[in-house]
Structure formats: C-alpha cells, structure tokens
C-alpha cells in the first residue's frame, strides 16, 4: 500500500479477503502495534483510508461489520473490532456470486442465517432496527438460499442473499453473536473447518441446548417463515427442525468428523473465554457446558 502510494482499499472477495484487508488497514494507521495487540474492541481508533467492499459470497457480512477475524499462530481465532473498520462503501453485485459452487453457497448462506438468529436472540444490545434487520434476513434466507443453491445462475436469488447477508451483518454488528460463533471459531482455528460449515452444523445444536430461554424469539422467527404450531415451544422446535432439514437438503452434515476428544477441553476453554462476558446470549455457558455441546456435535467414533 505504501510502496504503490495507494489511496484506498478496494476488496473483492469473501469474508477472509475482506478481513485481511481490514487488518492491513488497521496496521497501516497503527504502524507501531502488532495485530494481536489490537484484538478486542475499539483499539484501533484511527480513521483508515476509504474502504470499498465488494462481496462475492453471501455469508460473512464483513462488508458492513466492525470486525476482522484473524487466526493467530497458536491457531486461535480472535477479532479486531472497531467502528473505523466498517467499510465506507459496499457494492452488492449478484453477478459476482453467480459462479459460486453449491456447497459454498450453502455454507456461506447458513453463516448469514446464524448471524441473523444469534443477533435476534441477543439479550441486551438489540434495538428495533436490529430486530427488523435480523427478521428480514431470516425470511429472505429461508426463501432464497435453497433456490440459489439449486440454481447458482439465478440473479434474483443471488441478489436477495447478498442483501440478507448485509442485513444480518448489520444486525450482529450492533446486537453481537453468541455461543455458536464461540465454538465455530475453535473449529476453524484448530482444524481449518470452513466458518460457514461450522456455524451451519452448530446452529441447531446450540439452539436446541438453549431450550426455553430461546423459545419465544425462535417462535417469532418461526411464525415469520410460515411455521405455526400450537405453542411457542412447539414453534421454536419446528424452526430448529427446519434448519436441520435445510442443512440436509443442501448436503451439510449434522455432526463433525474432525473433532478429537483430547481437543475438547482446549476448545471449551477457548470458546468460554471468547463468549464470556461479551456475548449477550440467552444462556451463559461455563466451560463444562461448552464441552458438553462440543461433544454433542462430534460424530460417533
């Protein structure tokens, strides 16, 4: 950037290229700091050059978020989060995602769904606007993700998914994410599991584990996507079941084959440190509960 005397960042790609560019921008304005020392909230606090984000996947929402997620040398993921890292412009062009392979379409789409659902379940940081953004994203994803998966050249479905990813990203930037992400980051760090795949598998498992604490809001989402049962609990359970069914229809597994039993204590420790006390989740997990949920997500040996 300095050698070529650039005057802005133009990033075309998925979440990883965008986050890498955000990290570069942070180091550009904080030249005497290491990236790891900027981990956490509001540690950059400098205006970065104009940042233009052009997503080619509909998933991370990085084109509208404050965060850059980085994998450290110890394989642990951490986030550099600052308001200055929100891109100034986002260009949502569906033609750029038309050639995305079906499995990446599915995984990134479920990443966006996870952002929307976890933001919607946020206990403290939600506003009317973030709830509306999350609701809109969930409805759009339920309507358009599988269509985009089956027909990648369908530009209306691609455009709808890009907008849903943007809305979900905007929602969780204000309302935050939750325990699904805390566990997913450990899988990405230790095993290189694609973030969208990790979220897709974990989302129904964690929602089920939340139990009654999540039923009222999940029931509301169920109603919005056309699921109406006799009680809030039944509607919430049906919503979770439909997430599992969506995964199955798109070839996403319901468990992980990669998790080694000896890694679970470390994964639980990392997830617990990430989630607490930052994530405003319906149910606060201690390390033991994280370990139980991770074990539940592991395929039978």
Where are these regions (language model features)?
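Glycine/threonine-rich beta-strand-loop-alpha-helix active-site module
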Residues: 3-95
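Alpha-helical scaffold segments in soluble metabolic enzymes
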Residues: 23, 112-119, 136-147, 160-163, ...
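Short, well-ordered alpha-helical segments in soluble proteins
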Residues: 25-28, 32, 42, 58, ...
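Electropositive phosphate-/nucleotide-binding environments in soluble metabolic enzymes
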Residues: 60, 103, 107-111, 124-139, ...
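Carboxylate- and glycine-rich phosphate/diphosphate-binding segment that chelates Mg2+/Mn2+
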Residues: 67-175
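C-terminal catalytic subdomain
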Residues: 175-244
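C-terminal charged capping/lid subdomain of soluble metabolic enzymes
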Residues: 218, 225-301
């Amino acid at each position: 950037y300095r050698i070529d005397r650039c005057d802005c960042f133009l990033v075309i790609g998925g979440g990883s290229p965008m986050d890498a560019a955000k990290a570069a921008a942070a180091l550009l304005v904080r030249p005497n700091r290491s990236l790891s020392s900027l981990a956490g909230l509001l540690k950059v606090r400098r205006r970065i050059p104009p940042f233009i984000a052009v997503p080619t996947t509909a998933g991370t929402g990085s084109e509208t978020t404050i965060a850059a997620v980085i994998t450290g040398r110890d394989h642990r993921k951490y986030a550099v989060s600052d308001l200055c890292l929100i891109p100034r412009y986002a260009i949502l062009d569906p033609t750029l995602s038309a050639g995305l392979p079906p499995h990446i379409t599915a995984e990134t789409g479920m990443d966006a769904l996870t952002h929307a659902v976890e933001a919607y379940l946020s206990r403290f940081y939600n506003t009317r606007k973030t709830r509306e953004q999350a609701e809109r994203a969930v409805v759009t994803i339920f309507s358009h993700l599988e269509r985009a998966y089956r027909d990648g050249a369908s530009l209306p479905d691609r455009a709808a998914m890009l907008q849903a990813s943007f809305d979900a990203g905007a929602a969780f930037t204000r309302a935050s994410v939750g325990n699904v992400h805390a566990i997913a980051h450990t899988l990405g760090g230790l095993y290189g599991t694609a973030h969208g795949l990790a979220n897709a598998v974990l989302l129904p498992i964690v929602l089920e584990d939340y139990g009654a604490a999540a039923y009222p809001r999940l029931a509301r989402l169920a109603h919005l996507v056309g699921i109406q049962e006799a009680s809030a609990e039944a509607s919430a359970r049906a919503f979770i079941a439909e997430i599992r069914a969506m995964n199955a229809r798109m070839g996403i597994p319901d468990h992980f084959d990669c998790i080694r039993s000896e890694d679970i204590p470390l994964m639980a420790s990392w997830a617990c440190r990430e989630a607490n006390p930052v994530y405003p989740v319906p149910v606060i997990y201690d390390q033991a509960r994280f370990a139980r949920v991770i074990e539940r997500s592991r395929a039978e040996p």
